[in-house]
Amino acid sequence: MTELRVAFRTLGCKLNQLETESIADRFAASGARIVPFESGADLYVINTCTVTGKAEQKARRTIRQALAACPSSVVLVTGCYAQMDPGAISALDQRAVVVPGDEKARVLDLAAWLDSHWQGHGDLLHAVLEWRSGMSVPSTPIAPLASITLSIPGVTGSASQPGADHFAYHPNAFSFHSRPGLKIQDGCDNRCTYCRVCIARGSSISLASPEVLSRVRALESSGKAEVVLTGVNLAQYRDGNLRFPELLRMLHEGTDRIAFRISSYEPEKIDEEFLAAFALPRIRPHVHLALQSGSDSVLKRMARPYTAARVRQAVASLRAAKEDPFVGVDLISGFPGETDVEFAETLGLCRELDFAWIHAFPFSARPGTKAWDMRPCVPERIAGERVAILGALAHSGKASFAARQAGKTLDLVLEQSAAGSDGLSAPFRFGTSANYLKICVEGVPPGIRAGTAVRVLVSADTPENTPESQVELDPEHSDSDLHARFLGLA
């Protein structure tokens, strides 16, 4: 195949990031050249999100940018927004080819199809449309409570589309991340009143535990130091009677060196079984809780199955299980009817529990959810002010957590110094610590590659003029890096 330039942009969750990595891996294996999104590309692949209205606006803006970058390029759009509103995307331009989220796994086959059928001859758009028309299962929107039993080996649960392999995403190489993710669960059985991810991704399904272990062992054998266990709702992982805590134990017992990071978890599921697994040595001291509010009355309107008291108990238990773990939370501000008193309850809980990070965002009414029609609406200005207050608390909490690391010896995984570049001789290297801090490391010997676990000594100072622009930082860490000195391999 004539060298095809392909660029990728991922919007939304870690699950989307992993799925994009897998698609990029297939293109790279076929001989395509993966290029930065800002560069000219023949094919753009955009993996979208539908969690908020702003996420959809960002998706449309990104699509338009790709269309404008090169008049002959093809822009393939997939993901949750493509699932929920394919017509709005198709209307942007004839070069915007939509693959709804429930068919996303089929994009994994596009590179091989182009290699066999297109081979660089003729119009790329015509070729992609021909491939798209040959996809065997037509996409239909997922009903909120739809549940179709799967018949795929190694998968348990239900899904929106029979025969769709929701767990085909397992790249051999990672183009955009040094710490690989592993998708073990998809979909959600909760019906939170504000969320339509359950509509876009369907009911909960899980990758069978023997296959999870097999994939983790493959990552460990390839030299990966850490794997991020990823799903829409990890607390709903099921393989028969085996739940997520038992899976963690099985993975820990079945491997030798690789560490495990939990992408996110539900507060009410922080129970004795989870805590026992969390306390295991190679489970990273980091949990991100889907809190959403600290007010019992707001949580009830959200249909969240816990109270502020349960959150207090969960956080205290996490801190008892591991020394000073990184505990972050998601919060929605301006949920319909949220009063000043209710917001004060949320703010008070956050101050009391001193979270290491708060990801706060304003409520966005989503079509098809119960909250769409809830009243009274909180004015956008007030919701924004509340987000700003929580944001300030987030940064002070992160700074306090980071300051407690001064003088400590930490393990971390080195990151790439630039998209697709190891930066083996860079004066500074960046890495993500076991407790989820972005750290600038000095004195790393040349030749140590991204993805390697190293041990560092954290100093109290942050280096000036470090090349932070060379690394694509996680937004949670872009303003709170620490400085450390390389001690050796971990």
Protein language model features and the residues they cover:
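Short, solvent-exposed loop/turn segments at secondary-structure boundaries
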Residues: A55-Q57, S203-A208, R238-L242, R301-R304, ...
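Terminal RNA-binding accessory module
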Residues: D373-A490
